[in-house]
Amino acid sequence: SNDDAKIVCEVFNQAGEIAKAAGIKWGYHNHSGEFQKAVKEDDKGKRGVQGDIIYDLMLNGTDPKLVFFEMDVYWTVMGQQDPLDYFEKYAGRFPVLHIKDRSILGQSGMMNFENIFKKAYEKGLDEFYVELEGIRSGMTQFEGVKLCFDYLNKAPFVK
């Protein structure tokens, strides 16, 4: 619910204050579930109530000076959202990206990494991390990592 999201945001802000006092940053990494819609307690069970996307509630309910977001672009797409829309709407909130594809970067055809990187850099990206999961049969994790590295190393849009 919206009320639950508000509580989570309060906890995130408190954690961010504690982290800041210790000289470290506190951030959050999404999955696809954050792109579901939450509704107000009073609207639960009512027909036609659309609700708010949980991720938007989190971004709007947290202090950018205390909480950063590490967008997992794969799970954002799996949540039926466009990472570019989030970079535009919440510029500066994603200093870190979690780059992932269905398996090897650039091979699924479902992730437009060129547009993702270009817009992310334009809106404040500092660094990114790659996760490789769902490695196909017959390939070692090291071979998969090498293919991901090669893809990014050759990509003219990666700084």
Region spans (language model):
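Histidine-acidic metal/acid-base catalytic patches
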Residues: A38-V39, D43, D52-M71, W75-K159
